[in-house]
Design a protein with these regions (language model features):
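Glycan-recognition and catalytic cores of secretory/periplasmic carbohydrate-active enzymes
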Residues: 1-440
């Protein structure tokens, strides 16, 4: 073994060790902080902010004045969120926490981590959209956007796939009939409640909710992945046919430079970091399941665009390459989390992403971890947004680092090294719902 290789392995081992300590500290923070939080949408989730945002979309000039106080607070006084709304539980965050703890179980064999994962799955069973027959999830607040208001507990095809993945991961580790039934129900929801809109002979976009008109790229990518997976799990060819049309919509609407606009409506033509990751993650997962030939070329162009346009001069994720508006922050935890996820999925096919992965993970460990164990949420133009938000970065970063830790454990095992031990700082933590979570 040459010295360069030894040095590389040693450096990676040190990085993995630091990730282990950071994950341990985060779990202890989660136990003391609780499983509800404010959100980056807290400024607009309440009645005052919601009306101001709706006015902005109807009358830009007057509305700009109405939302100005919230935008000012977002940029300079992030803790003011508590004046506009209250902490909430977010299903999409619970799904990420469930997956993160499942990764820790896979890495260490520590059964308490699987118990932690199951705790969050139990919470997901409670938080499903109550007015729908099938299992599905959305936001716990009214979401005002340019097309109107999406009411709380309206299912979102950009949320439900995470719950699907969380239950599938647990089912593969511990097959339970109840989880299989939930997975079947989620697949039926994605296939029937979410609508298709023909865009070409071979492609269809899909609705974001059961009642909108479609056109959002990442929505189609999410649904294509979910139904492709479900077609394999349940042997349902109908799911695969629906998925293939949504997949073709994504492939047919990739720009010549390799990017994807957010939507094809001619209005939301921005290109940002985490939505680009969402699209390419879905493509990578579909390719792993099917070997679809067209995906390889799309990913090649996508990775080239991504690497050349969605990183700043320091080689770190930047929010937009084509922004829809002025942004009040320089970097975002969510972008970094999704970057880590994408690099882990694609580094074998695109080796240049290995250096990106190491750089971003190192940067998170050095600059974004707080003394209490949580992560900073945003790097503002002046200072930091240190308000911990489960839906907006905390859960995603926990999952991505746990995924990194699990993949590192697999690599170590392949090299014949001993299995990773349980994470340090073994303690018992209590969730905000008084349910015991062990960390040993």
């Amino acid at each position: 073994m040459n010295n360069e290789y030894k040095s590389s392995v040693s450096g990676q081992s040190q990085l993995v060790s630091t990730v282990s300590r950071v994950l341990s500290s985060f779990v202890q923070w989660l136990g003391s902080y609780g499983e509800t939080s404010w959100d980056f949408q807290s400024f607009f989730a309440g009645p005052v902010g919601g009306r101001a945002k709706a006015l902005y979309y109807r009358h830009r000039l007057v509305g700009t004045a109405a939302v100005a106080p919230m935008i000012f607070c977002e940029a300079f006084l992030p803790s003011a969120r508590r004046l506009f709304h209250h902490p909430m539980r977010f299903p999409i965050a619970d799904a990420h926490y469930a997956m993160g703890f499942a990764f820790l179980y896979q890495a260490t064999g520590d059964v308490s981590q699987l118990e932690n994962s199951i705790h969050f799955l139990t919470e997901l069973e409670k938080s499903r959209c109550p007015e729908f027959k099938e299992y599905c999830w959305g936001y716990p607040f009214d979401w005002v956007w340019r097309g109107g208001t999406i009411n709380r507990e309206t299912p979102l095809i950009t949320t439900t796939p995470y719950e699907y993945e969380a239950f599938l991961q647990a089912f593969e580790l511990q097959p339970r009939d109840e989880w299989k039934l939930i997975l079947e129900s989620i697949a039926r929801h994605a296939a029937t409640d979410i609508k298709d809109f023909r865009t070409s002979e071979t492609a269809s976009s899909c609705s974001y909710t059961p009642s909108d008109e479609g056109g959002v790229i990442n929505a189609a990518a999410y649904r294509a992945f979910l139904l492709t997976s479900a077609s394999k799990v349940f042997g349902n060819e109908d799911y695969l046919r629906i998925a293939e049309r949504n997949l073709n919509f994504v492939l047919e609407n990739q720009n010549p430079d390799g990017s994807w606009f957010y939507a094809v409506d001619g209005v939301r033509d921005f290109v940002d970091h985490y939505h680009t990751c969402f699209v390419m993650k879905s493509l990578a997962k579909i390719h792993a399941l099917t070997g679809h030939a067209g995906i390889v070329g799309a990913l090649g162009k996508g990775v080239s665009y991504y690497s050349n346009n969605l990183f700043d001069s320091d080689g770190l994720p930047k929010p937009f390459s084509r922004a829809p508006r002025l942004t009040v922050y320089k970097r975002e935890l969510y972008d970094c989390a999704e970057c880590i996820n994408l690099c882990l999925l694609l580094r074998d096919r695109f080796p240049q992403l290995e250096a990106t992965l190491e750089k971003v993970v190192t940067h998170i460990l050095e600059a974004w971890t707080k003394p209490d164990g949580s992560f900073r949420s945003r790097k503002l133009h002046l200072g930091w947004d240190n308000v911990p938000m489960h839906r907006w970065g905390q859960s995603q970063m926990f999952r991505s680092l746990a995924f990194y830790f699990r993949e590192s454990a697999k690599t170590a095992e392949e090299r014949g090294e001993a299995r990773f031990h349980a994470l340090p700082h073994n303690k018992e933590i209590i969730s905000s719902s008084e349910q015991c979570l062990t960390f040993s």
